[in-house]
Amino acid sequence: MAGKSDLPVIARDDNLSEETKTLISSLPTYQDSHVKLCKYQGCWYYHNTLQAVINYQRNFQPQDTDIILASFPKSGTTWLKALSVAIVERSKQPFDDDPLTHPLLSDNPHGIVPFFEFDMYLKTSTPDLTKFSTSSPRLFSTHMPLHTFKEGLKGSPCKVVYMCRNIKDVLISDWHFRSKYSNNEVSRSTLESMFESFCGGVSFYGPFWDHALSYWRGSLENPKHVLFMRYEEMKTEPCVQVKRLAEFLGFPFTKEEEDSGSISKLLELCSLGNLSGLEVNKTGKTWMNYDYKSYFRKGEVGDWKNHLTPEMENKIDMIIEEKLKGSDLKF
């Protein structure tokens, strides 16, 4: 097994309070060849990440104008962040202004929209939020399922956007991402091991189906509070979906903007080709030393067909169909 220092800080267990250590000792646990996971409120977390989740739940002070971008890992999070930043930024900087000063050209979307669990509450229970004091709305992000995440909102009606993606493409994207940050070759045996874990519901932030269902049901119960978006629809009808996102966030496109091509300009600014080609995303890193370029790969729908066997496809499809039965959520 990898030593502690070889693991990403989110996957270690060196930042735990005594209270959290005691809690973990009472939780269901799982250990693969590299890291330990524990199941808290129905979701699997690395130990340090669980500490961050608890810190967030207890100490975050929401504002009603906050915008929270949620997703299961490797579901189009970077793209959702870029689009949301660009939509909100229009109120401060129209596209006709100097484009070179746009924040997306000088920072990665993950640098602009921090994760509660990784960027804010991982190292401290009381992060400094003063840099957001002049921002309205404030943009944050999370991978927590809705029922866990809502504890930190303390009843606030702030906007929550969830991006959902086909689990098979999520799996392939996660497989490639793990290989990048661990500097290992893309291994078929690793994919097969990850596949079995995914099917068993044991993965970082898994089970996938419970995660998606939490936001799906939340969007049905309170559509003004939670917007459920699909990665595949973003790819097939980007203009329609960006308009939908902008309206939900409270920054709808005017007729003049639509007529002048603002939606197309925004989509081009946030495109994989444009963002991945920027110097900051070719050479920059997160504070956890992840290369920004590792967040950009193919972004394709259906890439899983190049990697999963028909038997694997059938197995995971049957599991998803069973787990989502009666919910009206389909893939």
Swiss-Prot record:
SUPFAM superfamilies xref list: P-loop containing nucleoside triphosphate hydrolases (SSF52540)
InterPro entries with a match to the protein in the record: P-loop_NTPase (IPR027417), Sulfotransferase_dom (IPR000863)
Location of the protein in the cell: Cytoplasm
Residues annotated for 3'-phosphoadenylyl sulfate binding in this entry: K74, S75, G76, T77, T78, W79, R165, S173, Y231, R297, K298, G299
GO cellular component, one term: cytoplasm
Annotated GO MF terms: sulfotransferase activity
Keyword field: Cytoplasm, Transferase
One Pfam family per UniProt: Sulfotransfer_1
Family: Belongs to the sulfotransferase 1 family.
Name this protein carries in UniProt: Cytosolic sulfotransferase 1
Species name: Arabidopsis thaliana
